[in-house]
Amino acid sequence: MARLSSLLSFSLALLIFLHGSTAQQFPNECQLDQLNALEPSHVLKAEAGRIEVWDHHAPQLRCSGVSFVRYIIESKGLYLPSFFSTAKLSFVAKGEGLMGRVVPGCAETFQDSSVFQPSGGSPSGEGQGQGQQGQGQGHQGQGQGQQGQQGQQGQQSQGQGFRDMHQKVEHIRTGDTIATHPGVAQWFYNDGNQPLVIVSVLDLASHQNQLDRNPRPFYLAGNNPQGQVWIEGREQQPQKNILNGFTPEVLAKAFKIDVRTAQQLQNQQDNRGNIIRVQGPFSVIRPPLRSQRPQETEVNGLEETICSARCTDNLDDPSNADVYKPQLGYISTLNSYDLPILRFLRLSALRGSIRQNAMVLPQWNANANAVLYVTDGEAHVQVVNDNGDRVFDGQVSQGQLLSIPQGFSVVKRATSEQFRWIEFKTNANAQINTLAGRTSVLRGLPLEVISNGYQISLEEARRVKFNTIETTLTHSSGPASYGGPRKADA
């Protein structure tokens, strides 16, 4: 009994110590008296583009537990495969291209049809990706017989003109939101004529990130000559790809290649960075262009696995918006009900597009931090903290970032012809509460509570409670515009 008591006392002391250590890591990190519209603090230049990194040590980003990155890929630019130790949610702010990801342990479901042609057969549809996740039947047991299959593929490459097989490749375009698990390698290629701009939020505070709160890209190819300049206290030196750390002899044995080729994999003399320019055609197996949004179908719970999970959805189609008013704009949300993979990432997104003088009614995030990135236009934004202080009151414009901590109230009003933004939220099913409007917190209070709480008459309380009949979007031209009865359409 005494031994059990001692063990419990030790466990309790250890728990208190660990809790205290965690709390002291960033004391009062969310006691924010002022927010700022943030610009990138570091720019990593490459041959065919650049990577812009925001300072994740900024108090408002540190409070939210996230970092933010913008990738600008020029035409024919290839962002070489890399992965992070954190969950990542990305948004295509501009342009179009291709995106590929490699999920550990999953089979190559995109393949040249000539792979399966008999020796004397005439290949049909060569170079076209079958790309059907339903081909899993043809790949059963692939993991067990993979090395043997590689040998067969080597023979086929000599006798049948075998080209390639790889994991899923998708077309991406403006408005696409892309969810990526930790450890999943990802690459992008710009096959359009304008720059491909992708912004990403990395959830550094995620339970899946077992490292510290620093964004750490792991490069499978390419390099970063400037080094990880955003990590404080680290000696700055060029960041190489992870193959560079192994000896060429080890790589030669692992890949069954000669030492000279193994040295090429290490990119030691390559200063192109991690976004390179492709010379000539970029021939990968790709599917046909997809429709605006996948058709909703009934599922039995077995169709989607980690290998076949859908990881993209487009938020730029007003016909799929959650809130839509032709004269004001629209708001679309993306959560784990729309994209089940977000349940594991514990992230979600909101896309907004409003016209000049339209206003998003005052609201706060009930269960998530939010990071707002402006993709087009300008808006006047006010943010109020838990102390009732206005911690931000100013303009945000294209390319700027504003972090809005959980519970902080915010109102947005478009000051340009059109204001468009994307918000990333640190909850798979983020919830908002509004201060004004048909579904607001004040609408749910009794008149007597409002009257006594604000020391106003019952008639004034009635106007406060019922005058705004919209739920999310309204005009900001002043009370005079609400003189007559209107139809509740938002």
Curated annotation (Swiss-Prot):
Give the span(s) annotated as Disordered: 113-164
Give residue numbers for the modification (Phosphoserine).
S332
Q: Give the intrachain disulfide bonds.
A: C30-C63, C106-C307
Residues with the Phosphotyrosine modification: Y330
Citing just one GO molecular function, the answer is: nutrient reservoir activity
UniProt record, GO biological process: seed maturation
From the Swiss-Prot or TrEMBL record, give the protein name. Cruciferin BnC1
Residues in the signal sequence: 1-23
Q: Which family does it belong to?
A: Belongs to the 11S seed storage protein (globulins) family.
**By its UniProt entry, which PANTHER family does this protein fall under?**
12S SEED STORAGE PROTEIN CRA1 (PTHR31189:SF30), OS03G0336100 PROTEIN-RELATED (PTHR31189)
- Functional summary from the UniProt entry: This is a seed storage protein.
Question: Which residue windows does the record flag with biased composition (Low complexity)?
Answer: 149-161
Which part of the chain is the Cupin type-1 domain? 35-263, 313-462
Query: How is this protein organized at the quaternary level?
Result: Hexamer; each subunit is composed of an acidic and a basic chain derived from a single precursor and linked by a disulfide bond.
| Listed Gly residues bias regions | 122-148
Keywords of the record, alphabetical order, are: Disulfide bond, Phosphoprotein, Seed storage protein, Signal, Storage protein
Residue(s) carrying Phosphothreonine: T109, T426
Cited InterPro entries: 11S_seedstore_CS, 11S_seedstore_pln, Cupin_1, RmlC-like_jellyroll, RmlC_Cupin_sf, Seed_Storage-Functional
Whether Disulfide bond counts among this entry's keywords is yes
Protein source organism: Brassica napus (Rape)
